[in-house]
Amino acid sequence: MFSRKGKNIMSTTEPIRDKQKLLDFKNYYLNEKLNLRNYTIIILGLNTALRISDILNLTYDEVYLDSKVQEHITIREQKTGKENRILLNHETRTALARYRQELVRTEMYKEGNPFLFPSPKKAGAPISRSQAYRMITSAAETIGIDGHISCHSLRKTFGYHAWKQGSDPIVIMVIFNHSSISITKRYLCIEQDDKDEVYRSIYQNAAA
């Protein structure tokens, strides 16, 4: 993805590394500026590693069955055309269940607009990527998160923290549907602090 000036935005987009700021960001639209739609989009992005285009194009029926959140969803990625089966963890299912109550209460979900995040202005369409970008950057700026934060930061944050907690990079590559480990390596946004941590901790658990 490129900006109007031709700058490669994808390569400069940063994950949210700091755990406390990540928690504040995650809950911003739940605790600070209530908006369950925005909250659910952020939770989905942080917990599924889906691209924002795939999140916005999710339909109600892909997520809910008999008014309940499904344990897995299966999508065909817009960018790659690859099929991806994704487990919805507890945090994600809880957010989606709460969001469904909001959809029903406000009648936001109506026949004729199948999308999970229906546009309030355009019939039969989801909200736009620019709307998602604005709400993500607004939350990040309010919280004071450093670095270039964009919609893609949700996906990169998933990868970074999966790697930090010890997940196999090969498994992360498969989750991302990347064609090579070198692409995944760039997504992890490993910094000097991360390397320093490895140097400090090596052999600490070895027997004396």
Predicted region positions:
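Conserved catalytic core of the tyrosine transesterase superfamily
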Residues: 1-208
